[in-house]
């Protein structure tokens, strides 16, 4: 060992070696001081809760070795019990005093023995006070080391089980555990029923639109319209082909929903514009006759000029089931969720989720945008190319 130290001293220098040893000593001293201050603590490496101890000694405690092979010896520290503080003078932690009239009645009934053990008789007759009565022998140090977080833990700490050792085990087991078990089972049943009720209320609040046929719920009306069109409409058409008899009505609301749809499955269009309140004969904004464009899901109508449609868009909306802005859903996934992520084509007014596109988009592009269908159909005449040429 000495040879190794001499080699290090020769290689690095004596002053460098002394500085390194001093820094190592300072680091160990700080580490030991920090450990002694933060005890008790939970060791993250071993998972053991370290408790305070007296294995840390100082230089002034060091003495010569007493046995052979000992370099140093340290004095043994005498163990001392922690001094307890006086119990708090809280009237709630004391036993209730027996009034004279109560004492007389208990003596008449023979509940109090002649030796004067009134406390035992009181605990025998009233098991409720047996639960709430405090235990004056509870160690105050244990209360300080384990802070009480709720009333149940506080009751568990001050429970007078030590005073009930002289009582019969049968009486003690009949009173407390069975009543507690019943209370727990009843509270569990009530809490589970309340949780189910709260969950159903939240579901009804989050998804107010329900299907009258199958009971499936949706967050908005476009989703319910899409469900009607793609689920029950196809079933109705298949039933009409197989059987000419009219189906039995499920409810009055379902009949109204079916009556609002035309023979082709589209919603019956309104005969007026939702923006200018004109009809196909006159546009109240321009004063000219103009054809109405109707939503295939809700039947709302509007003039193309009121909708700010371009001539290309006016021709494109006649080739597919056009949807208004409130009923618009993604043309790829077919859902209307995350409507803030919908991107509309400037040539056909179809909607697409930005994350459904290939490649996906994180932000909407600047200027005009054309979908893949319009790019294949219009090619160089698409709005996206017109915007690039104008810029």
Curated annotation (Swiss-Prot):
Region entry Disordered, spans: 79-147, 165-199, 233-266
Keywords: Acetylation, Apoptosis, Chromatin regulator, Cytoplasm, Isopeptide bond, Metal-binding, Nucleus, Phosphoprotein, Repeat, Transcription, Transcription regulation, Ubl conjugation, Zinc, Zinc-finger
Subunit structure: Interacts with the nucleosomes, in particular nucleosomes bearing histone H3 crotonylated at 'Lys-14' (H3K14cr) for which DPF2 has high affinity. Also interacts (via PHD-type zinc finger domains) with histone H3 butyrylated at 'Lys-14' (H3K14bu), histone H3 propionylated at 'Lys-14' (H3K14pr), and histone H3 acetylated at 'Lys-14' (H3K14ac). Interacts with histone H3 acetylated at 'Lys-9' (H3K9ac), histone H3 di-methylated at 'Lys-9' (H3K9me2), and histone H3 tri-methylated at 'Lys-9' (H3K9me3). Interacts with histone H4 acetylated at 'Lys-12' (H4K12ac).
Positions where N-acetylalanine occurs in the chain: 2
Full protein name: Zinc finger protein ubi-d4
Positions of modified residues (Phosphotyrosine): 172
Function noted in UniProt: Plays an active role in transcriptional regulation by binding modified histones H3 and H4. Is a negative regulator of myeloid differentiation of hematopoietic progenitor cells. Might also have a role in the development and maturation of lymphoid cells. Involved in the regulation of non-canonical NF-kappa-B pathway.
Native source species: Mus musculus
Family: Belongs to the requiem/DPF family.
Example GO biological process: negative regulation of myeloid progenitor cell differentiation
């Amino acid at each position: 060992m000495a040879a190794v130290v001499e080699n290090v001293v020769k290689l690095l220098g004596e002053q460098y070696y002394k500085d390194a040893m001093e820094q190592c000593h300072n680091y160990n001293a700080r580490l030991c001081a920090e450990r002694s201050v933060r005890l008790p603590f939970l060791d993250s490496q071993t998972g053991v809760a370290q408790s305070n101890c007296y294995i840390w000694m100082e230089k002034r405690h060091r003495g010569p070795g007493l046995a052979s092979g000992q370099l140093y010896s340290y004095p043994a520290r005498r163990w001392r019990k922690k001094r307890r503080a006086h119990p708090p003078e809280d009237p709630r932690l004391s036993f209730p005093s027996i009034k004279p009239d109560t004492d007389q009645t208990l003596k008449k009934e023979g509940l109090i023995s002649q030796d004067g053990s009134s406390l035992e008789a009181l605990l025998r007759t009233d098991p409720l006070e047996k639960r709430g009565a405090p235990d004056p022998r509870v160690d105050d140090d244990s209360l300080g080391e384990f802070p009480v977080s709720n009333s149940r833990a506080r009751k568990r700490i001050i429970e007078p089980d030590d005073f009930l050792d002289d009582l019969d085990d049968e009486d003690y087991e009949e009173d407390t555990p069975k009543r507690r078990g019943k209370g727990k089972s009843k509270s569990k049943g009530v809490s589970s029923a309340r949780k189910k009720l709260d969950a159903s209320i939240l579901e009804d609040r989050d998804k107010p639109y329900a299907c009258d046929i199958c009971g499936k719920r949706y967050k908005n009306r476009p989703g319910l319209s899409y469900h009607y069109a793609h689920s029950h409409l196809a079933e109705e058409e298949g039933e009409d082909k197989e059987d000419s008899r009219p189906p039995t009505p499920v409810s009055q609301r379902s009949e109204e929903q079916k009556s609002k749809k035309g023979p082709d499955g589209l919603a019956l269009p309104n005969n007026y514009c939702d923006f200018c309140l004109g009809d196909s004969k006159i546009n109240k904004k321009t004063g000219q006759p103009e054809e109405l464009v109707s939503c295939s899901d809700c039947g709302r109508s509007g003039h193309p000029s009121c909708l700010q449609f371009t001539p290309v868009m006016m021709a494109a909306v006649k080739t597919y089931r056009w949807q208004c802005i409130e009923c618009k859903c993604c043309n790829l996934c077919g859902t209307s969720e995350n409507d803030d992520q919908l991107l509309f084509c400037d040539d056909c007014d179809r909607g697409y989720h930005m994350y459904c596109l290939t490649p996906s988009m994180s932000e909407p592009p600047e200027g005009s945008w054309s979908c893949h269908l319009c790019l294949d159909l219009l090619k160089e005449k698409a709005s996206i190319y017109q915007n690039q040429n104008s810029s």
